[in-house]
Each structure stands twice: as C-alpha cells, then as structure tokens.
C-alpha cells in the first residue's frame, strides 16, 4: 500500500512544483540519442529549463517505481498500456542517474502520477499551493495549477473539473494506456452523457452506460 506519510514536503507559504520525472527522462533519452549527447547532462539541462520556465520555490520529482499494481488486476479484454513503445536503449542509464542524483519519489508498483496524486492531495488538505508539471493529461484528474510541458502554458483545474475529466475518461477510454472505455463513445457522446449532472449523478450515469453496453462484465471493465 502506498503510504502518504513518506511523500511530500513540509508546509510552506511558497509554491511547490510536482514534476513528472518520467516525461523528463524520456525527453532526455530521446534527445541524447538523436543529437549524440551525454544523457545525464541532457537530463540536467532539461530539468533546469523546466525550473526556469515554471519558477516554483521548491520541486518534488516523481518517477515510476517499476512494476504496476494495475497489471495484477485480471482483465479479459485489453492489456494495460499494451500499446506503449519499448524504452530507449539509454533509459536505464538515465533513470539510475536521476535516482542517485535527485533522490526522486519512487515507489515500487506505483506510477509517477500515483505518487504525485498522493502528494497533491496531502497539500490540498494542508492548503499548500502546488503546481503539477507534466504533459500527461491524466494528471488533470488531480486538479490544481497545471503546467503543460508540451505547450509550455499554465492553467488551473478545479477539483470538480478534475473529477469531471476522470468521468469523461471512463467513458472515452485512453488510447495511449490501451484503456478501451466504451466502444463508440468519444468526447461528444461523453459530454452528452455527463452534461448538467452533479458529480454523483455523473458517476451513476457512467455505471449505467457500462451496464448497458457490457452487461456481462461492466464492473470488471471499470476496475
């Protein structure tokens, strides 16, 4: 079980940046291969650029800990993250370097977005200001300040918007993670199902939609 007490910094009146280290590692690996660079220095440069662009007072770096508890959940339809590409040849070199130098938050069987969620929810409870720094849209389900590393822009996602986004994902699925959702349901249909409903009503509508389309295994598909 993921322990909240070991994740996060002490409360401060300054903003804490919660960084998706997985994204930075992959960026460093790909750039180093493409331009024939030292992957370790490449990571350092990328991380420093992120800090310069976001200007937070403190930073918390998160990297997936290896393995994933979701893969232990029995599924009869699609393999979780079955569509992901193989890791770059220099991935382990970069990841090990980052682990030793930066001491990121890494928990076995949990992904970076899992540990980032734990840290963010801890800050919400303590009224600590934080910024999520990633390009992974899944992090929007957490809510808060959201810095998009792909577009280099900052937006604010409320807790309600984060839950609404999660409900939409349950309906549409996630092609990147190989999560099917409901066949034939895209953003337009999902919005129609969720429109003008409270959060509880939205979740009830999601369950109803799954039971309608998949009467035999609706609940297992939602796991």
Language-model features, listed with the residues they occupy:
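Extended two-metal-dependent nuclease catalytic cores across DNA- and RNA-processing enzymes
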Residues: 2-14, 33, 56, 81-223
